[in-house]
Amino acid sequence: MIATGLALSVCYPNAGNIAGGGFLVYRTSDGKYGSLDYREKAPLLATKDMYLDSVGNVIPDKSLIGGLAIGVPGTIAGLYEVHKRFGSLSWEELVEPSINLAKKGFVVTKKQNQSFRSKRAEFISVNGKNTFFGRDYEEGDIVVNPIYAKTLELIQKKGKSGFYEGLNAERLVNTVKQKGGIISKQDLLKYSPIWRKPIQFKYKELNITSMSPPSSGGICLGQLFGMIEPYEIGQYDHNSLESIQLIVEAERRSYADRSEYLGDPDFIDVPANLILDSVYLRNRMINFDWNKATLSSEIK
């Protein structure tokens, strides 16, 4: 997991990073389950109205582009925590392949070329024309990133402190501030991943384990399975009108509950047991109709 994630951060950043975050759900060989929350956190200076204008309207893209769109990174702290608990190889060994990839380069695939080009204008708009991913890479090009290799070497040598302290932390904070962000050195020093109890539920004869809040995924999956379980969905063809109608209507109800009830359990009470209860889920589908979409006003 660690070596793969760091390697992806070099050659396929859509799927790997060192400045983002994530969730881990695991099952050990002796049947124990657990999960780790290492998602990004809001900076200490964040406020609930920071993406709103003076009259309370959402400012377009302010939460998506620029310095204020950036949360306090959790990836390296999360990977380091996983290594402390489960690692068998040394941290240095696990970071080494990504350093080699950054130094020696990787070959741009057709899909990567398309991905880079689709985001190139946005990278340049936010970071300037000299930004690394602002270059016009072609399929077959070899991409070498020696500056990133040096960052990874700091992480290899010093562990998570190589990212959250010292030179890298200073550069990260300064760059984010230049882009209008509010992440501080204190934010980086205070960051800590959290071991959480995962969500567990059944679908027919299957036992399913997934991520608990602040992820919405586990609860939404549990609700979705609970709402469709009374129906014999297996009798319908894949992507048939019947299967799509059932799944979409269940998803609409789950996402309505997601907006209403879910959030970070460190700050709010999430009524997980209530909204995963089988009686509640049956009642949620009481106005389901095979022949038409339920009005949104009747789903809230």
Q: Where are the model-predicted features located?
A:
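Noncatalytic scaffold domains of N-terminal-nucleophile
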Residues: 2-165, 170-216, 276, 283-292
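Short helix-capping/linker segments at secondary-structure and domain boundaries
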Residues: 84-89, 157-160, 228-235, 258-262
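Flexible, polar/acidic helix-loop-strand segments at domain edges
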Residues: 219
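Protein kinase glycine-rich loop
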Residues: 223
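Internal maturation/activation junctions in enzymes
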Residues: 230-300
